[in-house]
């Protein structure tokens, strides 16, 4: 960023163009650069929440990708999701415009800061948001670049006034190992992004580098409830690691006396830090979001807060100020006294965690769990097909749509229908159904919803838009529901 800082002082401000600026990771970096005073623009195929937000700040957005979009730009930023055949990439190469990977731009933003990088297969976005809340409660105003919309801020990125930067570190293409972090958090490690890594051991090796690349004065925070993370922690001796968990009796930070409902979780915490005599107990910590997995996410934030001496009051206040993250067990509506939940879960482990939370709540309300799942990417379904067959046990009624391609080509034999067929054949679920059209979910809700039920609409595709339009869709059929968000 030093070169860019010099060029920013020139009378002619050079332009940074983002291809795919509507993506959650790209939009966050674009917003930070804009707030730092750089001239930013970008393109995306369709308008969405992020493009509208950036436009409201005065950032120029092109809908569609075309060579003329980069006529007067000095730098082009891309993510690994952008096809190399994109016309703007081809034009940038032709004109020798520097092309910068998203992760490299993030690294430049982090290089001169004291940085917290949050990675792991699941829970990154919520953990990043929780860490940010604790920093703010401690009187530190961090810059934050997140992978989801933070409800407190109605954005996924914002510029702070302190020397701290908190960022979600995407592990999908191994670029996260090059991020210059001071503190590294690993929430869990599961088989994911194997289309890039090819095998699980290579993915685990990337997480090892994520820790060992820390400076000697930094530290890692790791969840040892997860057996792969525990083994990784046991194998690393050259960096300080603070561990946390619920089931791990030897973890440095442990949650116990846990109680959760539809809106919150309350628990106590035992802290036994390495090289520190004695044990500290923090009683009755409350986070305004349900689920065991979110308690684990909060323990990661507590570990950072304890290591940086935030104090118990700041930790509790920070959690009290947390308002959740968009699409993380978000209640969007009520129909016939049933709660309709929008959730980003798209990996088998995420699905299990989300449905376990829903089951716990439904049992307390004498209700049932109705899961409507939209698979995301043919490659993910192919690599994890057996895991997908086993992850819906906590759903009383299950509906699976066809696969949201996300730009991928179909793979023979890998469909939503084939998943339902295998689940039924192997008796993993006795009420698994295929939804040929997502719009058919309206009928599912009308026919099945009852008082106390939890209707969970899950996936990383367009099922979220569907969930947030349920009031209109129900009204078109002569029914009405209460919209929550």
Curated annotation (Swiss-Prot):
Enzyme Commission no: 6.3.2.8
Gene Ontology biological process terms from the UniProt entry: cell division; cell wall organization; peptidoglycan biosynthetic process; regulation of cell shape
Domain of life assignment: Bacteria
Catalytic activity reported: UDP-N-acetyl-alpha-D-muramate + L-alanine + ATP = UDP-N-acetyl-alpha-D-muramoyl-L-alanine + ADP + phosphate + H(+)
Location (main, coarse): cytoplasm
Record-linked HAMAP family: MurC (MF_00046)
Family stated for the protein in its record: Belongs to the MurCDEF family.
Protein name stated in the entry: UDP-N-acetylmuramate--L-alanine ligase
Organism of provenance: Rickettsia massiliae (strain Mtu5)
Gene giving rise to this polypeptide: murC
């Amino acid at each position: 960023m030093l070169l860019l800082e010099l060029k920013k002082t020139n009378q002619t401000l050079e332009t940074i163009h983002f291809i795919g600026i509507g993506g959650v990771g790209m939009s966050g970096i674009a917003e930070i650069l804009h707030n730092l005073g750089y001239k930013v623009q970008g393109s995306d195929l369709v308008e969405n929440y992020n493009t509208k937000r950036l436009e409201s700040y005065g950032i120029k957005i092109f809908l569609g990708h075309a060579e003329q979009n980069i006529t007067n730009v000095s730098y082009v930023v891309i993510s690994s999701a952008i096809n190399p055949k994109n016309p703007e990439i081809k034009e940038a190469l032709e004109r020798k415009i520097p092309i910068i990977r998203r992760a490299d731009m993030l690294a430049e933003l982090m290089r001169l800061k004291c940085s917290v990088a949050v990675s792991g297969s699941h829970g990154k976005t919520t953990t990043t948001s929780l860490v940010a809340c604790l920093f703010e409660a401690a009187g530190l105003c961090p810059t934050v670049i997140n992978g989801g919309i933070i409800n407190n801020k109605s954005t996924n990125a914002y510029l702070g006034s302190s020397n701290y930067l908190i960022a979600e570190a995407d592990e999908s293409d191994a670029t996260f190992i090059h991020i210059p972090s001071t503190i590294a958090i690993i929430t869990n490690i599961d088989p994911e992004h194997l289309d890039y890594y090819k095998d699980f051991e290579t993915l685990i090796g990337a997480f090892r580098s994520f820790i060992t690349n820390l400076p000697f004065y930094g530290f890692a925070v790791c969840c040892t409830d997860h057996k792969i993370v525990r083994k990784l922690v046991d194998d690393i001796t050259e960096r300080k690691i603070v561990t946390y968990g619920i089931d791990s009796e030897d973890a440095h930070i442990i949650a116990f006396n846990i109680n959760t409902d539809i809106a919150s979780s309350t628990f106590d915490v035992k802290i036994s830090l390495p090289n520190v005599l004695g044990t500290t107990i923090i009683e009755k910590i409350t986070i305004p979001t349900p689920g065991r997995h979110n308690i684990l996410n909060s323990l990661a934030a507590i570990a950072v807060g304890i290591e940086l001496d935030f104090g118990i009051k700041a930790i509790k206040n920070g959690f009290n100020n947390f308002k959740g993250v968009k699409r993380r067990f978000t209640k969007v509506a009520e129909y016939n006294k049933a709660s309709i939940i929008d959730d980003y879960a798209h990996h088998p482990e995420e699905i299990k965690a989300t449905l376990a939370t829903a089951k716990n709540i439904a049992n307390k309300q004498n209700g049932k769990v109705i899961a409507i799942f939209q698979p995301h990417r043919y490659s993910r379904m192919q690599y994890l097909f057996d895991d997908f067959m086993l992850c819906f046990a906590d759903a009383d009624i299950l509906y699976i749509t066809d696969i949201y391609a996300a730009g991928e080509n179909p793979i023979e034999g890998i469909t939503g229908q084939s998943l339902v067929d295998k689940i039924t054949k192997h008796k993993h679920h006795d009420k698994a159904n295929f939804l040929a059209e997502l719009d058919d979910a309206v009928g599912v809700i009308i026919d099945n919803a009852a008082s106390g039920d939890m209707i969970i609409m899950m996936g990383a595709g367009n099922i979220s838009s569907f969930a947030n339009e349920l009031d209109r869709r129900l009204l078109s059929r002569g029914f009405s529901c209460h919209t929550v968000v």
